[in-house]
């Protein structure tokens, strides 16, 4: 069984036992988290699809928090002797999917 969930403004296709990195969540490492915004559920019988499936949820365990590799940004203006360098490291939360519960379409 798989599901498509929404967190941090992004959509992720997940299955039980998978590990993935999502935008930073304010949950301590080792705790469980429940995602209620599930857009799609699929299995061998078919799929359930909708804006949000009523009663559907995905539970996950927070494995760790971290920061991604640095992305370097350079803004350059030719012939003006101007160059601006900037770096950014995005915070993320690594989660492991522990369960997918089905539901009815809203």
Swiss-Prot record:
Gene Ontology terms, MF aspect: rRNA binding; structural constituent of ribosome
Coiled coil: none
Keyword list, A-Z: Ribonucleoprotein, Ribosomal protein, RNA-binding, rRNA-binding
One example of a Gene Ontology biological process annotation: translation
Keyword rRNA-binding part of the UniProt annotation: yes
SUPFAM superfamilies per the UniProt record, alphabetical: L21p-like
Signal peptide: none
Assigned GO CC terms: cytoplasm; ribonucleoprotein complex; ribosome
Family assignment from sequence similarity: Belongs to the bacterial ribosomal protein bL21 family.
Assembly notes: Part of the 50S ribosomal subunit. Contacts protein L20.
Record NCBIfam families: L21
Described purpose of this protein according to its UniProt entry: This protein binds to 23S rRNA in the presence of protein L20.
Descriptive protein name: Large ribosomal subunit protein bL21
């Amino acid at each position: 069984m798989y599901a498509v969930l929404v967190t941090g403004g992004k959509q992720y296709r997940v299955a039980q036992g998978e590990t993935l990195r999502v935008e930073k969540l304010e949950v301590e490492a080792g705790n469980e988290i429940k995602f209620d915004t599930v857009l799609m559920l699929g299995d061998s019988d078919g799929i359930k699809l909708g804006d949000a499936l009523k009663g559907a949820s995905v539970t996950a365990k927070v494995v760790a928090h971290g920061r991604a590799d640095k992305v370097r940004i350079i803004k350059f203006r030719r012939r003006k002797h101007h160059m601006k360098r900037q770096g950014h490291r995005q915070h993320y939360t690594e989660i492991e999917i522990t369960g997918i519960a089905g539901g009815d379409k809203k």
